[in-house]
A protein has these predicted regions:
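Hydrophobic "lid"/C-terminal helical patch
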Residues: 48-51, 79-83, 112, 144, ...
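Active-site Tyr-X1-5-Lys
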Residues: 1-22, 51-52
Length: 188
């Protein structure tokens, strides 16, 4: 409810000309550091980090569980893109559900195994938690035509998600007032 209230407030303030605001609805962003953070979706990052580091991991959702995935790199690119959009051309459109990858846990494990080796699959076990599976394991596919038309994107596929999540890109920054942003995207 609080998210919808903020979206409504930003849209209303932008409509009145009080702010030049934008709101992005973010999916599960991976791969965060493996630290206790209280976030129920942390298992998504923990799975990726454990696999990459060759550590055993007990996944709290089933291999068939589906979730919305985006790398931190892709998320930052989308945030920068939102900041660069011409506010005058946006009109009333100020809220976007970002395009996401809709992947099962097994699809992510497949991509991890392709990069880090099939033998690491044996390090992953499954102990589905019904509550967590209900929250983060049954996400439906998303259609985001408005966001795509505005130039927002996802990681393209599971292999790119793994690469973008676990191999950080060069640092980027937003320009200071009066500065021009020059960004080059390198494909790993």
């Amino acid at each position: 409810t609080h998210k919808a209230m903020v979206e409504s407030a930003v849209s209303d303030l932008a409509r009145r000309g009080d702010v030049d605001g934008r709101v992005l609805r973010l999916p599960g962003i991976v791969a965060r550091p493996r630290e206790p953070n209280g976030l129920r979706s942390a298992f998504m990052s923990d799975l990726m980090r454990a696999f990459a580091e060759g550590e055993s991991y007990r996944c709290p959702v089933s291999p068939e569980a589906t979730a919305w995935w985006m790398s931190a790199r892709c998320c930052v690119n989308n945030l920068i893109h939102a900041a660069e959009l011409d506010g005058a051309a946006l009109g009333a459109q100020r809220v976007w559900q970002l395009p996401v990858l809709h992947l099962s846990i097994s699809q992510v494990v497949d991509a991890l195994a392709e990069r880090y080796g099939q033998e690491r699959r044996k390090l992953i076990s499954y102990a589905p938690d019904a509550a967590l599976q209900a929250l983060f394991g049954r996400m439906p596919p998303l259609k985001t035509p408005q966001a795509r038309a505005a130039g927002f994107s996802h990681d393209r596929n599971a292999a790119a998600l793994v690469r973008n999540s676990l191999y950080p890109a060069a640092p980027r920054h937003l320009p200071l007032t009066g500065e021009t942003l020059h960004v080059t995207a390198k494909q790993a």
